[in-house]
Amino acid sequence: MTEKGADGADGLTKAKSNAVSEDYETVNHVTGLKLAVIVTGLCLSVLLVALDNTIIATAIPKITDQFHALEDIGWYGSSYLLTICAFQLIFGKIYTFFPVKWVFLIAITIFEIGSAICGAAPNSTALIIGRAVAGIGSAGIFSGALIIIAYSIPLEKRPAYTGAIGGMYGIASVAGPLMGGAFTDHISWRWCFYINLPIGAVTILSILIFLKHPKQKLDNNQTWKARLLKLDPIGTAFFMPSIICLLLALQWGGTKYPWNNGRIIALFVVFAVLISGFIYFQIRGGDSATVPPRILKKRSIASGAFFLFTIGSAFFIMVYYLPIWFQAIKGASATSSGIMNIPMVLSLVVLSIASGITVTAIGYYAPLYYVSTVLTSIGAGLLTTFTTETSKGKWIGYQIIFGAGVGTGLQLSIIAAQAVLPLEDVAVGTVIMMFCQTLGGALFVSVGQNVFTNLLVKGVVNAAPGLDPQVVLRVGATQLKNMIPPQFLDGVQVAYNDALTKTWYVATALAALSVIGSVGMEWKSVKGKKIEPAAA
């Protein structure tokens, strides 16, 4: 390249850099009491979303007793996840072309309507519909909270607040089963959903009163029809049913239907066809696509999304299956197993906040990716060593290591997206990250369920030959000691332990794979500087 050409390229780069800087200078900087109220409201909104992921788990037995709908158990969780995954990416476009404040408030309102339907549900079908409606609102809440942070706080101060929101997500994800058990045992399972109404009302009021409209680059001269056409309706028409087909195949495969069943094969085939169509229209659509290729081609975005997919998946496997170990092996109740998860919660929250503060202080987030990968992998690996005799010190210590790893990395990809993208692209970048985390959790909780169920059945056959494995599956973890004949109990507990620890191998492998995202992450600073790692 000629010197002139090089200067021209440098000038273009500087122009883009300056454009990004100018974008961030237009942020409505909020301070003092107003900022505290807004951040509190945003944290409460994230609490709602994360609680609803897991709070229903311990309430399901009472719900099925009341509605006599044992066959609907899978739908209580999957209907919520299906609509979250189906609508999450489209919210990225909605936040780009419509006012952030009003989109966020509408998302919370939809979530509240869904929660009210669930709480008042007269039958199982109404509960499933309510969960699906709540999932639509939930799809726009977490990403919306992070987008509001982006529009309200300077980039260099943002990681600390992002860390606080990430910590709230971790608390609620793990505390959900504990709260669900407490409500179900002492009040009513309906309060697992009614509790969302006052919390959501506080969030709505705090945002409505204290948040000014962010300075978005909106074309107010466009008609609503023109804006709606920018939401990539063709891509959305391919994407939503493709994700639903994939999740249904994983939800039903190996449990309700064998993997070679025609329904499961058909779902995978339809998924492959539809997702291929979605990818084609994304490439063809350019900036009008739901996932603009120029954003996904950025190294930090692709690496951060992969990292969050793997770490998030590992985290959700442990969130769902670690309490089962406490119930089946240690004889804990549903509520007690939630309390025994506190070491992981505390370390996750402390490290999430500390990670955000560290990035704010030093500017660079890339080194913390490696810390997260190492700690999460070691912690997950240590958890796979559990036996029926594992001591209290070990199960506390191993949880702390795992939680510290997840907490360190959970919010880093959001920070990376906000550091490398201009402000008008932050909404889409944030939603891409959140979608990968949600999809990873949805996919691998289903994978974990299949691994666990199949290994438990085989283990019971080997360890307790005279016992029907289906009896063990129906009894559930909390009732093992009460319902399984004493002569079979030791063998069943060994089978449970082996099935669970091998399920955690999946989490360990995912944590180790996150190193790909760590290595791929660019070394950029939230303070506006870029450094390169030292050459080997």
Swiss-Prot record:
Keywords: Cell membrane, Glycoprotein, Membrane, Transmembrane, Transmembrane helix, Transport
Induction: Is slightly over-expressed in strain TIMM20092, an azole-resistant strain isolated in Switzerland.
Membrane topology: Multi-pass membrane protein
GO molecular function list: transmembrane transporter activity
Cellular location(s): Cell membrane
Transmembrane spans: 30-50, 80-100, 102-122, 133-153, 163-183, 191-211, 234-254, 264-284, 306-326, 342-362, 366-386, 400-420, 426-446, 503-523
GO CC annotation, single: plasma membrane
SUPFAM superfamilies tied to this protein: MFS general substrate transporter
Keyword Glycoprotein: yes
Pfam families: MFS_1
CDD domains reported for this sequence: MFS_Azr1_MDR_like
Glycosylation sites: 123, 221
InterPro entries: MFS, MFS_dom, MFS_trans_sf
Function field: MFS-type efflux pump involved in the modulation susceptibility to azoles, including fluconazole, itraconazole, ketoconazole, miconazole and voriconazole. Confers also increased resistance chloramphenicol and thiamphenicol, suggesting that it acts as a pleiotropic drug transporter with a broad substrate spectrum. Finally, increases the tolerance to cycloheximide when expressed in S.cerevisiae, but not in dermatophyte species.
Family: Belongs to the major facilitator superfamily. TCR/Tet family.
UniProt name for this protein: MFS-type efflux pump MFS1
Organism: Trichophyton rubrum (strain ATCC MYA-4607 / CBS 118892) (Athlete's foot fungus)
Top-level taxonomy: Eukaryota, Fungi, Dikarya, Ascomycota, Pezizomycotina
